[in-house]
Amino acid sequence: VGKATVLTFLSEVGEISRFDNPKEIQKLAGYAIVTNESCKHQGEKRISYRGRKRLRWVLYQTALSVIAKNAEFRQIHAYYTTRTNNPLKGIQSVVAVACKMIRIFYKILTDGVSYDGTKMTQDIVHA
């Protein structure tokens, strides 16, 4: 992830300490999951698109880039699209990777830890 991406992320998010958890940043970006439902009607779940369009665009483009160039993110993308329980479509998987990047950025910026790709891929179930 380049300097321009990090600077754009920080300029759109602002002070990271005002967020209690990464889900709040996910909501700010418009990646919150909403369901279109009414009474007995169960609609599909989708992202809300409410939030900062530029932040959402930067995260999506960065997710595409890291999937193409980073082995750990490529492995996560492959897992999301090929898992037997609830496999995601291509774009859904890219959005899931973007949300994972939000969680990684949040952890790095709040706790001051460094990026560790092996930690990130530990929760993948290998069949």
Where are these regions (language model features)?
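Low-complexity, acidic/Ser/Thr- and charged residue-rich accessory regions of DNA metabolism proteins
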Residues: 40-41, 77-127
